[in-house]
């Protein structure tokens, strides 16, 4: 088997986790108590779903996941919620006091006390796997636990499971909406770890997802439940090929191979868009709509950058012939630009399982959908926004004493800031080299 272990850190990670497992259970016909009635054998009784669920002797299906938080309130909601019987009590780990939106508390002081317990639980899950493929880590980088404990955990996972893939699904601070004053500090500090310790980091941004809910799903005032369910649809599409059989299945390691051109462009900021919901659209139409700026789940305009790589994950009633035609059309468009050293740039996956929707959920039931995950130079916009806010605060050393008081050194701030500046520069250079090349060609003509 090619098992995958999911790790949900902090409030955002846990709430996205709730939405994801709710959806996975519906997709596989697993009830909230973990039972899977035999008459609902989806996919003819194959065991592809065992990549995400382990089976106990009592025929109960238990998610291969761990929920971690430094304070109990959010995890208590899982302990008392609809799916309380689904999870093993040992998989829900909470501390006594929270990280107070402080990266240093999550990473150095309070996080340090709980991290060994977390790794112990992860080790138990890993021991149950016959061929562990990798980890999916869910967190946000604006708060204290997601950023601090999340990056500490990634560092430790790199040591213990060096060769395993690590995919991060990370919620970045939104341009306009802020939940904490110190968000820029936390995000820059934890991006440093994401760069070093994840293989692919998928960026999500509440404001962008909020806009999709409002514009595409006509929800006037989206709640976090709406946002999380939409994010869960995206994650479900990305992992569908691990859980179901399809025509062109995509492995976790294949994301890495296809999205990462060379190591300096490491954060592989993939901006996924889950498309199609209302009318029955053709494959070409859903493919085109996936490339629209309005579909991006991180606030950046892909028209300002160039694509280095792009994975298209189709599900439902889709045949390879239609996909090839749709991709050929995209390649002829002038608005969608690829870097010239990567002319093909497309990786496609097809899965025959159509998207499942949560009863009373927002998206309508559709026959086919596409989820795009891409590496584009436009993502530099996200970093420059965060960097700018970081610089404004750090110039005055505002709030720095809270971090130093928890055992951090001030030098760390400038070190991680330089790292991010280098990343921004990498993305810019990828774009610039190309412009020079185009100029030469015109000169020759």
Curated annotation (Swiss-Prot):
Lineage: Eukaryota, Sar, Alveolata, Ciliophora, Intramacronucleata
Residue positions binding Mg(2+): 71
Substrates-to-products reaction catalysed: GTP + H2O = GDP + phosphate + H(+)
Binding sites annotated in the UniProt record for GTP: 11, 71, 140, 144-145, 179, 206, 228
Key words, A-Z: Acetylation, Cytoplasm, Cytoskeleton, GTP-binding, Hydrolase, Magnesium, Metal-binding, Microtubule, Nucleotide-binding
Entry EC no(s): 3.6.5.-
Compartments it resides in: Cytoplasm, Cytoskeleton
Summary of the function given for this chain in its UniProt record: Tubulin is the major constituent of microtubules, a cylinder consisting of laterally associated linear protofilaments composed of alpha- and beta-tubulin heterodimers. Microtubules grow by the addition of GTP-tubulin dimers to the microtubule end, where a stabilizing cap forms. Below the cap, tubulin dimers are in GDP-bound state, owing to GTPase activity of alpha-tubulin.
SMART domains hit by this protein: Tubulin, Tubulin_C
Cellular component per GO, a single term: cytoplasm
PTM annotation, UniProt: Acetylation of alpha chains at Lys-40 stabilizes microtubules and affects affinity and processivity of microtubule motors. This modification has a role in multiple cellular functions, ranging from cell motility, cell cycle progression or cell differentiation to intracellular trafficking and signaling.
Domain of life where this protein originates: Eukaryota
GO biological process, one term: microtubule-based process
Active-site residues, Swiss-Prot/TrEMBL: 254
Cofactor dependency: Mg(2+)
InterPro entries found in the cross-reference section: Alpha_tubulin (IPR002452), Tub_FtsZ_C (IPR008280), Tubulin (IPR000217), Tubulin/FtsZ-like_C (IPR037103), Tubulin/FtsZ_2-layer-sand-dom (IPR018316), Tubulin/FtsZ_GTPase_sf (IPR036525), Tubulin_C (IPR023123), Tubulin_CS (IPR017975)
Entry annotated with the keyword Transcription: no
Subunit field text: Dimer of alpha and beta chains. A typical microtubule is a hollow water-filled tube with an outer diameter of 25 nm and an inner diameter of 15 nM. Alpha-beta heterodimers associate head-to-tail to form protofilaments running lengthwise along the microtubule wall with the beta-tubulin subunit facing the microtubule plus end conferring a structural polarity. Microtubules usually have 13 protofilaments but different protofilament numbers can be found in some organisms and specialized cells.
Similarity-based family: Belongs to the tubulin family.
Pfam families from the UniProt entry: Tubulin (PF00091), Tubulin_C (PF03953)
PTM annotation (N6-acetyllysine): residues: 40
Protein name: Tubulin alpha-1 chain
Main location: cytoplasm
Gene3D superfamilies: Helix hairpin bin (1.10.287.600), Tubulin/FtsZ, C-terminal domain (3.30.1330.20), Tubulin/FtsZ, GTPase domain (3.40.50.1440)
């Amino acid at each position: 088997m090619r098992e995958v272990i999911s790790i949900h850190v902090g409030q955002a990670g846990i709430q996205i986790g709730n939405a994801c497992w709710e959806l996975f259970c519906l997709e596989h016909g697993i009830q909230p108590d973990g039972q899977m009635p035999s008459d609902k054998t989806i996919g003819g009784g194959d065991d592809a779903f065992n990549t995400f669920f382990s089976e106990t002797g009592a025929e109960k299906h238990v998610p291969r996941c761990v929920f971690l938080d430094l304070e109990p309130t959010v995890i208590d909601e899982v302990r008392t919620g609809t799916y309380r019987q689904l999870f093993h009590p040992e998989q829900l780990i909470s501390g006594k006091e929270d990280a107070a939106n402080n990266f240093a508390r999550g990473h150095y002081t309070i996080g340090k006390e709980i991290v060994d317990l977390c790794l112990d639980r992860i080790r138990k899950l890993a021991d149950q796997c016959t061929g562990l493929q990798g980890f999916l880590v869910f967190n946000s980088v604006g708060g204290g636990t997601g950023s601090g404990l999340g990056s500490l955990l990634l560092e430790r996972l790199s040591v213990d499971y060096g060769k395993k893939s690590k995919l991060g699904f990370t919620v970045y601070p939104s341009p306009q909406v802020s939940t904490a004053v110190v968000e820029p500090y936390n995000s820059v500090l934890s991006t440093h770890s994401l760069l070093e310790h994840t293989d692919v980091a998928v960026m999500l941004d509440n404001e962008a997802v909020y806009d999709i809910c409002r514009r595409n799903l006509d929800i006037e005032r989206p709640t976090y439940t709406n946002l999380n369910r939409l994010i869960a649809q995206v994650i479900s599409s990305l992992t569908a090929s691990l859980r179901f059989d399809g025509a062109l299945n995509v492995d976790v390691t294949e994301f890495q191979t296809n999205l990462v051109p060379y190591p300096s462009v490491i954060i592989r900021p993939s901006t996924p868009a889950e498309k199609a919901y209302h009318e029955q659209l053709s494959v070409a139409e859903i493919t085109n709509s996936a490339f629209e700026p309005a579909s991006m789940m991180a606030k950046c305009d892909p028209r300002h950058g160039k694509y280095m790589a792009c994975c298209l994950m189709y599900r439902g009633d889709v045949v390879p012939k239609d996909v090839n035609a749709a991709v050929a059309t995209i390649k002829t468009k002038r608005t969608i630009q690829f870097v010239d050293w990567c002319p093909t740039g497309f990786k496609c996956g097809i899965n025959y399982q159509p998207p499942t929707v949560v009863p009373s959920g927002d998206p309508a039931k559709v026959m086919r959908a596409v989820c795009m995950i891409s590496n584009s130079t436009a993502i530099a916009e996200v970093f420059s926004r965060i960097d700018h806010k970081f610089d404004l605060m750090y110039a005055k050393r505002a709030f720095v004493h809270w971090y130093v008081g928890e055992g951090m050194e001030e030098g760390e701030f400038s070190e991680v800031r330089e790292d991010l500046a280098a990343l921004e520069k990498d993305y810019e250079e990828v774009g610039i080299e190309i412009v020079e090349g185009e100029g030469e060609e015109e000169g020759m003509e």
